Amino acid sequence: MKRILITGAASGLGLALAKKYASEGWSVCIADIQDEEGIKVAAHLNEEYANDCFFQHLDITSDTQWRELVALISERWQGLDALINNAGVGASGDIDTFSIEDFQWTVDINLMGAVKGCHVCVPLLKESKGLLINVASMAGLLHMGSMSAYNVSKAGMVAFSEGLLSELDPYGVKVSVVCPTFFQSNLATRMRSDNPDAAKIAARLHAGTGITAESIATIVYNDSRIGKHCILAGTRFSDRTIWRLKRFLPASYLSMMKSNARIQFADKNPSYRERGIFERVLRSIRARIL
């Protein structure tokens, strides 16, 4: 029976991933800071699939807790076949008003939590020629203004994963990085921002997308098994188009991003006049989304 460790698996995408892998016959370690929910998830998976699933409290920013978890897994399972670094938080804010403490908090969880997990789990994955999956975001590829902390943490995850792809290839370890856009999740409940309405806006974006965490989990399961590195799970046609625009017409992409920033500025400063038709078109699109 294959063995997988998933961080942030008590809710959201992590929960969907835990259910998907358990349904495919994997033993799952549900690692999370949400003890009550995590215990319930493990009990449900064992009842539903009769696998060796268990919960372990894990603060992914703690080196000590990571080492203790790996020791527990080594004793219980005698190895590990896959690690999914899924746990994360949301963040938004302008660079001069978003606190340095919140910036550090975002990077510590979204990026350094995964780094610490890989540091202690990769030796087990080398032994099993296993699978490493890091959950980033479309924000790791497309960088909106007023989201510097989140962008940095997710772009760092993309770069980290790409480096590990070649580093771990000689050991037979497959590495994937997942870059979804908005999907139905509870990320908005775990975010910090300098805008009091940010959580409400984020929740509305996540809820209205029509893309479920379960559909993302299925894509991740299927694509990672065949060794796909960058998994654009759940991304809409518009997101893929913007990603292609950035890759092939970077100047046009940057002009579009600056126009979007001017719209955001106009929202905060009613006396500011938008410069042209491009801004008005973007505002119309944003109105339909928000």
Regions found by a protein language model. Name each.
Residues 10-11:
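Conserved glycine-rich cofactor-binding loop
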Residues 35-36, 57-68, 100:
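The beta1-alpha1 cofactor-binding region of Rossmann-like NAD(H)/NADP(H)-dependent oxidoreductases
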Residues 96, 142-148, 152:
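Active-site loop immediately N-terminal to the catalytic Tyr-X3-Lys motif
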Residues 94-95, 99-105:
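Substrate-binding pocket helix/loop in short-chain dehydrogenase/reductase
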Residues 137:
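Residue(s) in the substrate-gating loop at a strand-loop-helix junction
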Residues 118, 153:
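Active-site helix of classical SDR
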Residues 170-237:
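SDR active-site lid
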